[in-house]
């Protein structure tokens, strides 16, 4: 048994060397079409069309024609495409992309209608030999196959691979159809589990978004649409300036910024998540002297003052700082540190109030700048909001804190599955 022709991880009872052929010898190229998105619709038609974009956006390696949403060709006639219809087991490549996803492929599964492929950047193939369902789709998305494409890519900003070069790549597969089946089913089950976890995460994200709208009063109302049990009465209209102050960050000297990781981390708007919240990445490391009153503490509440995105995705939004062992977080410029002037406003309640759509809309509309948007402490403090009694504030903060814990757990579970898939994509193919 040749080690180079066998995967590192293998199902029991299989020990034969894998077969290999060039893609050009193993596949027949299929006809392509030059239809654009303008020729398609999602409502009705006789023929469905798989486009370049349908390949790049799909995480899974198999396109399930029963469940994936594929558009129709507007006014498409069967007689015009009858020799081009796809079959189960056909594969489609995206031959260009702005990153190394060029060469991403999907396998067609569960064909229940008339499907064709179109687009200048798609290449469709049909295997000349019968392979087990799901095997090809996952093999073609493995590192074992994709590393062959790296030396064949052309271009600088936009990468591409030609049909001629694609034909030179080597396809490897077990001689045993049973082994092919077990590999294909294993990855297909992983993809289905990932899809279910993504759906669950999306549902929780949508629930939080809906509750942020319904558990805070609408403009002109003194009570929210949805209220926690045991609370009643009107909320009091007030400005944030009646409860809090906001301190600007320090302009740390760029001469002491470090490309080498240190324990001193300057926070930037890049550490804020879209919608609000903290992310421990994109730190700027620092190795200079630090003013003591610009060292941040666990559970400090900060807001962003600057945003570079077109939609001002994080402008004015909050983050509560976690404890990051071995790191000291520094209060950098372009961030505001919130302090509480009295005991009338709960920090948890304020954290989620600053994530509401009405607050963010106010901040964006009052922002200055074109390419770079800016807000200020005064503008944030001038925000007019409705505030309930302190006990209800705490209860609302706890409700959303539990939702966020659920979101973090679901994100971790999803990432674990994706990491597992990536690990086995490297170890179960050659």
Question: Where in the sequence are the language-model features?
Answer:
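Short amphipathic coiled-coil heptad-repeat segments
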Residues: 1-15, 199-233, 412-430
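Hydrophobic, ordered structural segments
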Residues: 186-206
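Acidic/polar-enriched heptad-repeat coiled-coil alpha-helices
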Residues: 184-188, 397-401, 405
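DNA target-recognition domains and sequence-specific DNA-contacting regions of bacterial/archaeal
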Residues: 27-173, 242-387
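Short, charge-patterned binding micro-sites
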Residues: 222, 238, 330
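Non-catalytic DNA-recognition/assembly elements of restriction-modification systems
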Residues: 8-34, 227-250
């Amino acid at each position: 048994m040749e080690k180079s022709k066998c995967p590192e991880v293998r199902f029991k009872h299989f020990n034969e060397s894998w077969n290999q052929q060039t893609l050009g010898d193993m596949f027949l190229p299929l006809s392509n079409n030059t239809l654009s998105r303008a020729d398609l619709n999602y409502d009705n038609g006789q023929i469905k069309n798989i486009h370049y974009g349908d390949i790049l956006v799909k995480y899974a390696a198999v396109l399930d024609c029963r469940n994936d949403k594929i558009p129709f060709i507007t006014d498409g006639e069967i007689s015009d495409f009858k020799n081009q219809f796809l079959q189960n087991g056909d594969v489609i490549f995206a031959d260009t992309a702005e990153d190394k996803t060029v060469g991403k492929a999907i396998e067609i599964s569960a064909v229940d209608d008339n499907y064709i492929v179109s687009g200048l950047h798609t290449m469709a193939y049909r295997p000349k030999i019968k392979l087990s369902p799901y095997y090809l789709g996952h093999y073609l998305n493995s590192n074992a196959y994709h590393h062959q494409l790296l030396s064949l890519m052309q271009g600088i900003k936009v990468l591409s691979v030609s049909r001629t070069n694609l034909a030179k790549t080597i396809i490897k597969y077990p001689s045993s159809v049973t082994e092919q089946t077990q590999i294909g089913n294993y990855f297909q089950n992983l993809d289905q589990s990932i899809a279910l976890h993504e759906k669950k995460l999306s549902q929780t994200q949508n629930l939080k978004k809906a509750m942020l709208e319904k558990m805070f009063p609408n403009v002109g109302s003194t009570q929210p649409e949805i209220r926690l049990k045991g609370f009643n009465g009107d909320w009091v209209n007030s400005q944030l300036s009646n409860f809090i102050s906001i301190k600007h960050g320090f302009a740390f000297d760029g001469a002491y910024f470090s490309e080498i990781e240190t324990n001193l981390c300057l926070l930037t708007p890049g550490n804020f998540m879209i919608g609000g919240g903290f992310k421990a990445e994109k730190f700027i490391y620092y190795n200079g002297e630090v003013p003591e009153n610009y060292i941040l503490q666990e559970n400090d509440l900060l807001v962003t003052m600057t945003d570079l995105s077109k939609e001002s995705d994080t402008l004015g939004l909050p983050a509560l700082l976690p404890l990051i062992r071995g790191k000291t977080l520094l209060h950098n410029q372009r961030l505001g540190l919130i302090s509480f002037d009295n005991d009338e406003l709960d920090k948890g309640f304020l954290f989620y109030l600053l994530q509401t759509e009405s607050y963010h809309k106010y901040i964006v509309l009052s922002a200055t700048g074109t390419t770079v948007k800016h807000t200020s402490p005064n503008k944030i403090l001038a925000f007019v909001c409705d505030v309930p009694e302190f006990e209800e504030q705490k209860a609302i903060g706890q409700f959303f804190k539990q939702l966020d814990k659920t979101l973090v757990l679901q994100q971790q579970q999803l990432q674990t599955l994706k990491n597992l898939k990536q690990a086995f994509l490297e170890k179960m193919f050659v």
